[in-house]
Amino acid sequence: MQHALRYTEELDSKLKDAMAMLVLHLVARPWAETIAWTASIRAPRVNLFVTGSSINEQITGRCFTEDVKEPPHNLFYSQTTVADKEPRMSSLEVDTSDPLEWVEKLYERSEQRPGRIFRLPDENYVLLAAQPDFDEDWFHSLDAQDAAKIERVEETKTLETRRFRWHCGCNLDRILPILGGWRDKPDDLFKGEPAISIQCPRCGAKFSVTRDMI
């Protein structure tokens, strides 16, 4: 297995921002959820995908830059999955290509509560999610400097700790069923080659597949 994905500095930064936002959002949500976000952006033309789970404390994602259709508007999709329940879907038209602004709009439109997000130095981020009976004037007056020192000037308490890591969980056992439809026509799939390379749609990991594996 190999990844070998290389993005432009701009796309790499957006992917990191989106993954950071998803981790903070997962921490602000109940434990049993798996959440996936997809953003379809006009400029730069890219489909950005991130997904994570508090159950497994893992997150992964990638950018799709090849054969991407230009959407009429920048679109942001969110899917929340809980075991034994139908996934909850929402979609938003977003004005910018900034993941932080997407997530603030997600809170405004889909979470039914406001959220404030701040990008701090040294790749640190803050997400403040409003709770019932919150002080609206105080909440909306905060800036990045206020957010950076909030633990020092406000009374706070750690409710729980979740430790996320970059991990997709993909492997050949999960990838091979995708090729099940080619089992009866391997010549069309391999085209004379001894092996082919297939890619995980979630993280971009590449796997080498030979005829005897199908």
Outline where the language-model segments fall:
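Interaction interfaces in information-processing and related assembly proteins
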Residues: M1-T158
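Cys/His-clustered metal-coordination modules, chiefly Zn-binding fingers
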Residues: A130-I214
